[in-house]
Amino acid sequence: MKKILVVDDDAMNLKMACFILDQKSYPVITAMSGEECLEVLEREQVDLILLDVEMPGMNGIATLEKIRQHKEYSSIPVMFLTADATEDTVIAAGRLGADGYIKKPYMPQDFLEQVENVL
């Protein structure tokens, strides 16, 4: 089964994503910051990263940039999971190689479909 890393600074958003992914029995690891995401990637192999954009410290765009620069995990698919759907953010995400963009709030079925399309 594919392992998914969910990164969001909001505990309720993490719980919601984990609950939905659990319905399909996906193993999930969570992180609450960009820095913690990079720490998890040093010790865990994951098949997909769901990454919030607006986080304190290293935001999602900066985190994606670091992920893409790192040889060991640069090829892991990354989808943004965020309420920040500004045109600039979408353009920056695409330029850095984001594999998708899920806008919050989302419907559970739509969320799962988009995740499964990338996996």
Please name every model-derived segment.
Residues D8, D52, T82:
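Active-site residues of response regulator receiver
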Residues M55:
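Receiver (REC) domain active-site loop signature in two-component systems and cognate sites
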Residues S25-M32, V40:
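Short hydrophobic/Thr-rich beta-strand motif most characteristic of the beta2 strand and flanking loop
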Residues M12, M32-E36, N59-E65:
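Acidic catalytic/metal-coordinating carboxylates
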Residues C18, A62, A85-I102, E113:
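Alpha4 helix (beta4-alpha4-beta5 surface) of REC/receiver domains from two-component response regulators
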Residues Y106-E116:
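C-terminal output helix
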Residues K15-Q23:
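Charged docking surfaces used in two-component/phosphorelay signaling
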Residues E44-L50:
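Active-site beta3 strand of CheY-like receiver
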